């Protein structure tokens, strides 16, 4: 299963400076889970399919790598496409900053993951942050803590999704951020939009 805890970019300063308590963690065993609430578990880190979903450790940016590799395999021949597999997104967007200054893109689409809010929040209340859910397609950002996504690019992605009958969702403005936060500051500014896998 997957052990879920509050992501570091959503945690308060006090939560970041202390160990995660066992009772604040959740384990999702999928539909075939036989464990009961309160059972103890150990790690067995393997990539696997659970219904239509996948489970893996450190999937956050790895899923982006898979998406970009697939994009390379099917890239249109009539555009100049540049992909950056960057590092240190969670600790200062450092790799994206270097890549953006090196490549000087005309526009950028940041690919990331975002928390799915299908479960109650960590205090047991209805979860109203982000509004992204599993099974409803990629999440197109409108804004986050470091970026107001370019409305032309947001609309462009929506138009493509509608035309191609691709289910998508708009991620409501909230905390967190993506590499777009640094890419947009390159030169006199770069139009950016982020797309995430919930």
Give, region by region, the residue ranges found by the protein language model.
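N-terminal hydrophobic/helix-forming segments and targeting peptides
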Residues: 1-198
């Amino acid at each position: 299963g997957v052990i879920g805890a509050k992501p570091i970019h959503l945690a308060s300063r006090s939560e970041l400076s202390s160990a995660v308590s066992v009772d604040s963690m959740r384990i999702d065993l999928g539909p075939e889970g036989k464990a009961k609430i309160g059972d103890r578990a150990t790690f067995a880190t393997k990539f696997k399919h659970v219904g239509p979903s996948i489970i893996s450790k450190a999937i956050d940016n790895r899923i982006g790598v898979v998406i970009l590799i697939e994009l390379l395999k099917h890239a249109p021949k009539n555009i100049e496409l540049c992909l950056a597999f960057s590092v240190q997104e969670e600790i200062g967007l450092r790799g994206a900053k270097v890549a953006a200054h090196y490549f000087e893109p005309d526009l950028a689409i940041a690919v990331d993951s975002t928390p799915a809010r299908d479960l109650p929040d960590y205090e047991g209340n209805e979860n109203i942050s982000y509004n992204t859910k599993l099974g409803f397609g990629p999440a197109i950002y409108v804004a986050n803590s470091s970026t107001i996504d370019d409305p032309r690019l947001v609309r462009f992605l929506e138009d493509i999704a509608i035309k191609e009958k691709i289910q998508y969702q708009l991620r409501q403005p909230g905390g967190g951020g993506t590499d777009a936060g640094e890419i947009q500051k390159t030169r006199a500014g770069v139009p950016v939009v982020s797309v995430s896998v919930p």
